[in-house]
Amino acid sequence: MASLRVERAGGPRLPRTRVGRPAALRLLLLLGAVLNPHEALAQPLPTTGTPGSEGGTVKNYETAVQFCWNHYKDQMDPIEKDWCDWAMISRPYSTLRDCLEHFAELFDLGFPNPLAERIIFETHQIHFANCSLVQPTFSDPPEDVLLAMIIAPICLIPFLITLVVWRSKDSEAQA
């Protein structure tokens, strides 16, 4: 049966990082980011005079984005107290993103684009600025449990040392 391992096929094996991904892939991604830096990953909107701007495409997209924003605000305003609860806001947030993406495709603009990014950032600043991850606070166990956890290994160590020494003397006597 043929093995699927790279070494058997004769190809070079890529060195792996701690997380298991090939180091060459990570270096390639890093090189791409360094050689081609962008302020944002968004695709730029066409300006007037470019082929994609005939008929005021960008202006129409801005109007459509305003519709998406107003619809999102109408959905979010009644939820006011639960803005940090993902179960409550996931639907309006997803609807906003889908709306922005739909109109970007409709007007032959890339997504994400600067206007869509600005809307997303704005909603984060308005609705989610005061949200933080709730992390449980850890406390020490009760004192009796803590003492048991400390004393048990301390008592076991001399017993285990005695057992090892005793067994090693037995093996020396047999040899």
Curated annotation (Swiss-Prot):
<keyword id="KW-0732">Signal</keyword>
<dbReference type="InterPro" id="IPR006985">
    <property type="entry name" value="RAMP"/>
</dbReference>
<dbReference type="GO" id="GO:0007186">
    <property type="term" value="P:G protein-coupled receptor signaling pathway"/>
</dbReference>
<dbReference type="GO" id="GO:2001214">
    <property type="term" value="P:positive regulation of vasculogenesis"/>
</dbReference>
<dbReference type="GO" id="GO:1990410">
    <property type="term" value="P:adrenomedullin receptor signaling pathway"/>
</dbReference>
<keyword id="KW-0675">Receptor</keyword>
<dbReference type="InterPro" id="IPR038126">
    <property type="entry name" value="RAMP_sf"/>
</dbReference>
<feature type="site" description="Required for CALCRL interaction">
    <location>
        <position position="139"/>
    </location>
</feature>
<dbReference type="GO" id="GO:0043116">
    <property type="term" value="P:negative regulation of vascular permeability"/>
</dbReference>
<dbReference type="GO" id="GO:0009986">
    <property type="term" value="C:cell surface"/>
</dbReference>
<keyword id="KW-0813">Transport</keyword>
<dbReference type="GO" id="GO:1990409">
    <property type="term" value="F:adrenomedullin binding"/>
</dbReference>
<dbReference type="GO" id="GO:0001605">
    <property type="term" value="F:adrenomedullin receptor activity"/>
</dbReference>
<dbReference type="GO" id="GO:0002040">
    <property type="term" value="P:sprouting angiogenesis"/>
</dbReference>
<feature type="transmembrane region" description="Helical">
    <location>
        <begin position="144"/>
        <end position="165"/>
    </location>
</feature>
<feature type="topological domain" description="Cytoplasmic">
    <location>
        <begin position="166"/>
        <end position="175"/>
    </location>
</feature>
<feature type="topological domain" description="Extracellular">
    <location>
        <begin position="43"/>
        <end position="143"/>
    </location>
</feature>
<feature type="glycosylation site" description="N-linked (GlcNAc...) asparagine">
    <location>
        <position position="130"/>
    </location>
</feature>
<dbReference type="GO" id="GO:0001570">
    <property type="term" value="P:vasculogenesis"/>
</dbReference>
<dbReference type="GO" id="GO:0008277">
    <property type="term" value="P:regulation of G protein-coupled receptor signaling pathway"/>
</dbReference>
<dbReference type="GO" id="GO:0072659">
    <property type="term" value="P:protein localization to plasma membrane"/>
</dbReference>
<dbReference type="GO" id="GO:0015026">
    <property type="term" value="F:coreceptor activity"/>
</dbReference>
<dbReference type="GO" id="GO:0150060">
    <property type="term" value="P:amylin receptor 2 signaling pathway"/>
</dbReference>
<dbReference type="GO" id="GO:0035924">
    <property type="term" value="P:cellular response to vascular endothelial growth factor stimulus"/>
</dbReference>
<dbReference type="GO" id="GO:0005886">
    <property type="term" value="C:plasma membrane"/>
</dbReference>
<keyword id="KW-1133">Transmembrane helix</keyword>
<dbReference type="GO" id="GO:0005737">
    <property type="term" value="C:cytoplasm"/>
</dbReference>
<dbReference type="GO" id="GO:1903143">
    <property type="term" value="C:adrenomedullin receptor complex"/>
</dbReference>
<dbReference type="GO" id="GO:0031623">
    <property type="term" value="P:receptor internalization"/>
</dbReference>
<keyword id="KW-0325">Glycoprotein</keyword>
<keyword id="KW-0812">Transmembrane</keyword>
<protein>
    <recommendedName>
        <fullName>Receptor activity-modifying protein 2</fullName>
    </recommendedName>
</protein>
<keyword id="KW-0472">Membrane</keyword>
<feature type="disulfide bond">
    <location>
        <begin position="84"/>
        <end position="131"/>
    </location>
</feature>
<dbReference type="GO" id="GO:0001525">
    <property type="term" value="P:angiogenesis"/>
</dbReference>
<keyword id="KW-1003">Cell membrane</keyword>
<dbReference type="GO" id="GO:0010628">
    <property type="term" value="P:positive regulation of gene expression"/>
</dbReference>
<dbReference type="GO" id="GO:0015031">
    <property type="term" value="P:protein transport"/>
</dbReference>
<dbReference type="GO" id="GO:0007189">
    <property type="term" value="P:adenylate cyclase-activating G protein-coupled receptor signaling pathway"/>
</dbReference>
<dbReference type="GO" id="GO:0008217">
    <property type="term" value="P:regulation of blood pressure"/>
</dbReference>
<keyword id="KW-1015">Disulfide bond</keyword>
<dbReference type="GO" id="GO:2000352">
    <property type="term" value="P:negative regulation of endothelial cell apoptotic process"/>
</dbReference>
